[in-house]
Structures are given as C-alpha cells and as structure tokens.
C-alpha cells in the first residue's frame, strides 16, 4: 500500500468513526491506522501482510472483530486477482467469513459459505470515480454514500447473522497459527543459511534437537524448522503476555511505541527490562538465536504487536487471550504429550485432601496439572495469595516452563510470585533455596523448598534404553538405596523405565502426611520389572488405589494406555494390611462432564461405590497370592476372587512345557525367502512366520527360512550357486539407519548371514501380541517359528497326549491365563512376554482319568478346526460353552464357569475398547 492509499484508508476510518458516534449500529468502531503505518516494503520488495487495511469492531474496546476491508484506489479494479486474493487471505487469517474490497469506485462484499468465497453484493454507486484525482474531487460523494447507504446496508448483514463476528482471542489464535505455518520454513532456512557461517548455530540446534525430538514437535522432522517454530512462538507469546500485563507493569507499555524500525535486539532488551521488574523470567527469557529472523517475518511480528496496541481489553478478554495463547503453544509444540484437562482435573480431585498446604508438580510440562490445582483452589474461594504460596512447579525442560508460567498467571495475580523453576527432579531436595523475582517490586527472594503435602504429576515415559547419561548415576544410587533399605529383598531391574525411579525419589520430598497422585503408562502393571516396582512402592508407600480406563485411551494422539496411581507416605517399613483399590472408570474421561468428574472424585474420597466406575479391592496377601500365579496387576481391576478356588487344579506351565520365543535374527528380507527362489533345498527350512496366517488349531508352516552354516568358500567349492547368490545379494546392503548388514547381523559363533533354527522349534504356538483372537495352535511336528510367536514343547512327550494339552490350553481357564499375563497396548493388542507365559499356570492333566481325558478331547474336537475370528463371540457359542463346562466338570469346578467367563470377557472388552 503506497502513501496515497494509506492516507485515503485513514480518511475512510476517520469518517466511519465520526458517523458511528451518532448512530446505534451493530458496528461500533473502525480501526487499522496503526497497522497501516507498518505496511512498508522490505529492501524494495512487497511483503505478505496479515492484517486488513481497515477493521470493523463490534464494541468500543475493539475486542470483537466483525470484518476486514482491503483498500485500493480506482486504478486497481475490484476484479484484480491479487486484490481479491489478498482480501480473502487476510479474512482467513482473521478467521472471519466476510471481507470488503473497496477501491472508491466499486465496493464488493465477499462472503464465505460451504462452497467457498463468493460475491454476495456489489455496489456501483460511485462509478463516476475513475482515478486517484477523482477520489479527492468527489470526497463528499463517497462520504455520503458511506454514511447514508453503505454502512446501513452492511449493518443489516450483521443483524441478520449473514456475517459472523469473532472475539479477539479467537482471532489471535488463528493469526498465531498462520504466522507459524506461513513462516516456519522461512525462518528455518534463514537459520540454516546463518549456520553455514557460524557452525555454533548448527551445533546448538542439533544438540537441542537430540533432547527435544522425542518429547516435542512430533510433527516436524527438520530440526531447523522445529526450532524456528519455537522462535516464532516465543516472540508471539512474549508480545501477547506483555500486552496482558501492561496495565500493571509500566515497562510493558513501551510495546505501544514500537515502530517498523524496531529490531529483535531492541525488543529483547525491552523484555529484559520487563523481567527485571517482574517475576516472569521464564516467559520473557530470550530464545538463543531468536534474533536470526528474516526481515519480512520480523515486520509481520511487529504488525502483530501493533494489532494488539489499541485494544482496550477487559480482564476476561485478556484472560481468554492468555489461555488461547497457551493452548496454541501446546498444540504447536508439545501436542500429544499434554495432559488432557479432564484427566488432570480427576487426578487433582482424587488426590488432594488439603489444599491449604504445599503442592508440587515436579514434571509440570505445560502446567495443565498446576492449573487444575489453581482452579480447584479458586472454586473454594482460596485467596490468590494462598494459591501462589502453595503451588510449586518445576521441569527439566525450560521451554515447558514458559507455558506453565502463562497457565498459572491471571489478570488478578500479576503481583504474586509464580513458584515455577527449572530443575532436574533428582536434584530437588527440601534443603534447597530457589531464587524468584518479586513482580511487585523486582526484589530477589530466596525461598526454601518445603516438604510437600501433595505431589501430583504426569510422569515422563522414557524407556530405559534412552535414559539421559546425566541421570544414570542418580538412578544407580536410587537402585542401591532400595536394595539397602530392603536388605536386598527388592532390586529394581536395570531395564526399569525412567519414571520408576521418580516414584521412589518423591518419597524424600513428602511431609509425614504426604500424598502422591501420578499418571503413568500402564505397562508396569504386567511386566517383570513392574512387579519389582510394585514391591518397591509397597515398601515406601501405602498404595491407596490404581485407576485405569474402561473405555479407550486418555491421551488422544499417543498410542499408550495410562493409569493413575495414588499413594500415601508410609510411616513404617512393616508390611501394610491396607486394602488396595483397583478402579476402572466406565466411560472415557474425555467424554465426561466436569460435574461427572466431581461425582467420581467425591465418591472415591468417601470410599463409596459409584455409577461411574467399577471397583475391586484386595488385601496385600490376596495380591501376592495372585502375583505368585503370574496373574498381573492389570487383571485385578476385574473380579477374580474365584482364583483361590482353582488353586488345587492348576500347576506352573513350565512344569509341563519348555517355553521358547521365536527366532529373532534382525533382517527378514535376508532370512525369509520368497516362494520363487533358486536356493538349494538343503538350506531351506519350513517356518511359521506370523499368527495372522494361522487359521486352524492345527497349524502349518507358512514360509521358508534361509538357514546356511557353510562359508562362502565352501559353497563355491560344491557349486551351490543359489545360496551363494542369495548371500551376495545382501552383502553390500545396509539397514534402515544406513549401517551395513554385515556389521549389524554379526554374532559370535554365527556368520552374519547364518540362522540356526535348533532352539526355535515348537510344538504349540500363540501370538506374542494377540488381539481378538486368543488361542493355542498345534503343529504336526516341531517347526521353526518366527520372533512374533511364542512356542511350547512338552517336557514329557511320552506322558501327555498332545491333543489333551491342546484342549486344556484352549479351555476358558487356559485362555484366561494368557490374558491375565499381559497388558493392553494403545492399539488394543495384548502385550505378552516369554517370561510371563513361562511363569503362567495351566490345568493339571495328572488329575484326570482316562475317561475324563477322552471326554475333554472329544468335546474340543466338536469345536471344529477353525480358530474363531473373535473369541468374545465364540466363547458364548453353545458348543464352546459345552466344552468349557466339560473341562471344568472334569476338575470338579463347573459351578465357577460363569465367574471365569465374566472376568475373561470383561478383560478382553476393556483392552479392545481402545479401538471403539
């Protein structure tokens, strides 16, 4: 927009506002003067402008946006594509469904409907204005048209709802999204270009990415573009927050006088000055290299600042703007890892019994849990002073703390300290002092970390394989402390995930009446390492409850199932007789209303039953008895009180079978051959590759494995060219990470291309990750199996009939023990481990007479050969019911059939509900 266009646009704004003073229309104010002044060129080139030349508002404070206008002079026709596209682009940015094209000759109203942007009306009243001189010459004419006709007609569209309006915070959220998506690649490329001349930039961003890739920015794979997003969001967030606090912080008001010549360095210096008089360091802290931003992008960021300048915003609008900015930051940067608000609310209300006491979230992420604590306190009329005195939040990652600080700040709390700080959880102790800045006078305050009455957190899920090197020494000391405290009775596995150690470490931060509420992955409920964790937790705490979902995932975009663990600090290491509650919430938390969450937490705290959850309660003695039979903690959410009735008819599975895991060699294309191949017969071994191909209780191999132990020279000597060619085909190949197969497949006592099936032959098999099909299948003769299968071999093959063993394994009790050994993954599959199957139980065949054996085998044969597609349907089929009752009757326990079936079906339905 050139000077003449800007001048006439400002005249237009002035005339609209003079008219609106004397009338009562839906339109209350026009604006845009400030952003017009910034619409300069960059090095002689035009740049993309986000904001319309003129804005109409629905209130005097300019907090409700109605419409944007694009202004040109008559020499630009309203049919000009660039003119039209610019107007529509800016309307999209503002999330508005209409726009005006005004060139002082013709005026066009575009409205967006389901078919896109369409001309809704065109005004030709000023057709005599043909050039720039005419605009001045006929000024009275276009002013009269504007006031007497156009604004009146336009107002009617707002009155009848044809044109929608948007509150400022929604507009701002949309603008932020456009800023990020339009400019992240530009900024990323600019960073890369600068990194060519300064390798420190590249080193810093790559190191940052090594920490951030797994936890942040799941939608980005270029570290420079990902870092560009953090730079853009940092500028936008700081500018927005400075405007929010400008009424109570004089320095922040200096943003109102920034102009198009302000540099990133100057604005960073201003934010530093604001920080010195406030406690918002984590918000205003400079991002490293944030000054490396292209001029056109920087001018647009200044436009955004200018857009916010003249808005006289109420406290509520400011708060909405603040919360919307926080939500946008979460979506753009952290996404799937953010704790859902309703889950955070439930955690807080189930755990906290005393709100007037210190509360900590040591892995606060974006502050969802502390924010829910704050809301809970506000609902009970606890003063802002007490709220800020008692809420503490920390995190290892500084980026997350910026959002936490925003989340805990309101327009009513500007003069209170947010006790938010960066610290590795394993470095926290109650003797430390943390330095904060008083927002009221800028003074430095050293506050001691207290013993906490409540600790609440969504603990990070970091597998043991990728635990940071800097934490390994601390983790080793925690493992040693557990061993020493328990006199060697409890030893956490070295394969324990990161959060295991956090749970134990938190004990040192609690006061004597302390409670802990944690959101965890559910994997610990059915693994060997999880059992050791359970022992360790029971040693240091009274476990009050474990809660899971009975319907679907709690985290929308992450393929994990979760649990809530609530603990009370134990005062003695003596064995507790406390009853542990296993709670399963019937509906997905995210589908519940806030009132329903209140009811759940109230019923829970009162120890009452509830319409919203099922509860099973067991003593430690009962739990230890279940665990001794390899029934996982995950199974205890269901009524399995009948288990003690079967104790005399079952025995450990490894008394009868040797359990094997199928062969894992590392590169299937090499070791599993296509049907058409030229490899010599002696190197071909039938293999069962996948449970997916098993349709019958009597399985057959479904593939061919390459098993060659000869050297290449030996193959050449006997002219086995087929095997030699097959090996040569892969000799120069690399894996998915670019490493040579010769290196990654190398094993002691094996050639890199060698696979020996000897220890992977099985008589019975099942899937390692069953879904709806849970079964055992029998092979005609021991066959080679792939890593995706678990196999069994009868130890005393001359003593037990294979047909009998197949029937007992597939009985309802046999299948129950499979389901009870594992836990549900985020996609609904059951996660089994060889170790868990090995420790599982089966019906004892030694208790059966020959007559009973024949009854069971014949009843099983009546089911037919085919494995049912869904066990839930087949289990209630009359023939299947007859078979299961026959088995139980032979063992003298037919009366508990329905109890077993109910538990079994409920467990499977819950696991598979994630796919609903």
Regions found by a protein language model. Give the residues of each.
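Nuclease catalytic cores
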Residues: 1-17
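Active-site metal-binding core of divalent-cation-utilizing nuclease and nuclease-like domains
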Residues: 26-62
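Charged, often flexible domain-edge or linker segments that flank or initiate folded functional domains
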Residues: 52, 57-59, 63-88, 92-287, ...
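Signature of N6-adenine DNA methyltransferases within the class I
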Residues: 94, 99, 106, 110-149, ...
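P-loop NTPase catalytic cores that bind/hydrolyze ATP
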Residues: 224-251, 457-458, 500, 508, ...
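Class I S-adenosyl-L-methionine
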Residues: 248, 276-350, 824
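Polybasic, glycine- and aromatic-enriched phosphate-binding surface used to engage nucleic acids
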Residues: 624-862, 869
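Amphipathic alpha-helical coiled-coil/heptad-repeat segments
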Residues: 811, 851-916
């Amino acid at each position: 927009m050139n000077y003449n266009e800007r001048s006439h646009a400002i005249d237009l704004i002035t005339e609209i506002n003079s008219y609106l003073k004397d009338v009562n229309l839906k339109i209350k104010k026009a604006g845009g003067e400030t952003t017009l002044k910034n619409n300069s060129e960059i090095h002689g080139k035009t740049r993309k402008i986000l904001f319309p030349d003129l804005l109409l508002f629905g209130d005097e404070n300019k907090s409700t946006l109605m419409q944007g206008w694009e202004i040109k002079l008559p020499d630009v026709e309203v049919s000009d594509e660039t003119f039209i596209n610019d107007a529509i682009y800016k309307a999209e940015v503002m999330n508005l469904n209409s726009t005006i094209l005004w060139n002082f000759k013709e005026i066009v109203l575009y409205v967006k409907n389901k078919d896109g942007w369409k001309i809704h009306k065109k005004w030709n009243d000023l057709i005599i204005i043909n050039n720039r001189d005419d605009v001045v010459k006929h000024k009275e004419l276009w002013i009269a048209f504007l006031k007497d006709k156009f604004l009146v007609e336009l107002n009617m569209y707002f009155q009848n709802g044809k044109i929608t309006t948007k509150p400022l915070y929604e507009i701002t959220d949309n603008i932020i999204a456009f800023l990020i998506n339009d400019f992240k690649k530009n900024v990323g490329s600019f960073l890369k270009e600068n990194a060519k001349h300064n390798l420190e930039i590249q080193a810093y961003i790559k190191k940052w990415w090594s920490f951030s890739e797994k936890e942040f920015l799941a939608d980005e794979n270029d570290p420079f573009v990902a870092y560009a997003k953090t730079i853009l969001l940092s500028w936008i967030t700081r500018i927005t927050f400075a405007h929010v606090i400008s009424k109570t912080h004089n320095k922040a008001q200096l943003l109102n006088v920034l102009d198009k010549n302000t540099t990133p360095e100057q604005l960073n210096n201003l934010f530093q000055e604001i920080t010195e008089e406030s406690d918002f360091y984590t918000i205003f802290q400079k991002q490293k290299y944030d000054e490396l931003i292209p001029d056109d992008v920087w001018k647009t960021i200044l436009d955004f600042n200018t857009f916010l300048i003249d808005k006289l915003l109420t406290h509520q609008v400011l708060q909405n703007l603040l919360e919307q900015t926080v939500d946008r930051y979460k979506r753009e940067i952290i996404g799937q890892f953010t704790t859902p608000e309703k889950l955070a609310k439930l955690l807080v209300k189930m755990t906290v019994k005393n709100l007037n006491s210190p509360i900590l979230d040591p892995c606060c992420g974006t502050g969802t849990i502390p924010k829910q604590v704050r809301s809970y306190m506000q609902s009970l009329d606890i003063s802002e002073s007490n709220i800020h005195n008692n809420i503490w939040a920390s995190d290892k990652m500084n980026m997350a703390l910026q959002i936490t600080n925003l989340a805990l700040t309101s327009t009513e709390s500007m003069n209170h300290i947010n006790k938010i700080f960066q610290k590795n959880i394993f470095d926290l102790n109650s003797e430390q002092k943390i330095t904060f800045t008083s927002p009221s006078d800028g003074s430095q305050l050293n506050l001691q970390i207290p013993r906490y009455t409540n600790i609440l957190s969504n603990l990070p899920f970091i597998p043991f394989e990728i635990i940071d090197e800097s934490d390994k020494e601390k983790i080793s000391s925690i493992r040693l402390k557990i061993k020493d405290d328990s006199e060697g009775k409890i030893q956490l596995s070295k394969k324990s995930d990161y959060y295991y150690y956090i749970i134990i470490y938190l004990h040192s931060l609690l006061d004597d009446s302390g409670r802990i509420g944690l959101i965890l992955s559910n994997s610990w409920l059915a693994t060997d390492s999880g059992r050791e964790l359970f022992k360790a937790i029971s040693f240091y705490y009274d476990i009050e409850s474990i809660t899971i979902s009975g319907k679907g995932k709690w985290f929308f975009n992450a393929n994990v199932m979760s649990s809530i663990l609530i603990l009370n600090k134990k005062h003695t290491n003596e064995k507790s007789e406390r009853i542990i509650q296993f709670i399963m919430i019937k509906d997905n938390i995210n589908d519940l209303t806030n009132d329903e969450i209140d009811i759940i937490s109230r019923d829970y705290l009162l120890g009452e039953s509830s319409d919203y959850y099922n509860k099973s309660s067991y003593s430690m003695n009962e739990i230890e008895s279940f665990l001794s039979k390899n029934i996982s903690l995950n199974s205890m959410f269901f009524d399995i009180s009948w288990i003690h009735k079967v104790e005399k008819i079952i025995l450990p599975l490894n008394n009868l079978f040797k359990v094997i895991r199928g062969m894992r060699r590392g590169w299937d294309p090499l070791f599993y051959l296509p049907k058409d191949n030229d490899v010599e017969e002696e190197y071909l071994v039938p293999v069962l590759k996948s449970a997916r191909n098993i349709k019958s209780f009597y399985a057959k191999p479904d593939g061919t494995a390459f098993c060659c132990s000869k050297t290449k020279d030996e193959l050449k000597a006997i002219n086995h060219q087929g095997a030699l060619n097959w090996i040569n085909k892969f000799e120069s190949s690399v894996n998915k990470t670019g490493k040579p197969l010769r290196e990654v497949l190398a094993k002691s006592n094996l050639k890199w291309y060698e696979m020996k099936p000897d220890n992977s032959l099985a008589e019975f098999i099942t899937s390692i990750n069953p879904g709806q099909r849970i079964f055992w299948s029998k092979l005609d003769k021991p066959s080679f199996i792939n890593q995706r299968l678990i196999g069994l071999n009868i130890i005393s093959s001359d003593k037990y009939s294979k047909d009998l063993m197949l029937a007992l394994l597939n009985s309802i009790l046999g299948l129950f023990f499979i389901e009870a050994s594992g836990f549900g993954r985020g996609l609904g599959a059951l996660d089994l481990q060889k170790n868990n199957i090995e420790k599982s139980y089966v019906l004892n065949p030694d208790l059966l007479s020959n007559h009973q054996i024949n009854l069971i085998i014949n009843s099983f044969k009546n089911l037919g050969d085919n494995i049912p597609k869904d066990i839930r349907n087949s289990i209630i089929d009359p023939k299947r019911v007859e078979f299961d009752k026959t088995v139980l009757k032979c063992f003298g326990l037919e009366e508990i059939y329905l109890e077993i079936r109910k538990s079994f079906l409920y467990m499977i339905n819950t696991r598979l509900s994630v796919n609903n």
